[in-house]
Amino acid sequence: MLRKLAIAAGVIGAMAISGGAQAQNGFRLCNLSSINLEVAKALNTGNKDPAGRPIIISEGWYQFAKGECAVLWSGKLQYRYYLLYGQAKEANKEWKGDIPICVSRQPFTITSDLCPPDKYRRMFFQVDTGENDGWTQNLRD
């Protein structure tokens, strides 16, 4: 019996140290790369505008020093899929995917699928958080 308790305690301790993908409520991002980076986030709300286009909310830029973690969406996760794009301009490196989302060179919040002429698109990657209340996404070299 004591051996089973010791094993269970060891497993629980290992899970706490590893910072598992579902450690706390909210969506947390950690920069585990060796360089500073900036991140844009986006969310397809599932709603449509009056013209029938999807309402996608994108925001940026969030600055992350190497080793830094921060919450991008707080509280219990309301959606299954979240979109991210990361870049380190000085290192000419990107964390990207295949979903085009509108961004701006300056800090921004865009609430449309349309991309005005003074904005541009970057290729975001999708994070599937499953049915979890919280998620930690790590960006690595």
Tell what function each PLM region has:
Residues 1-9:
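Bacterial N-terminal signal peptides that target proteins for export
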Residues 8-16:
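Bacterial N-terminal signal peptides
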Residues 20-66, 71-77, 85-141:
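Intrinsically disordered, low-complexity segments enriched in small/polar residues
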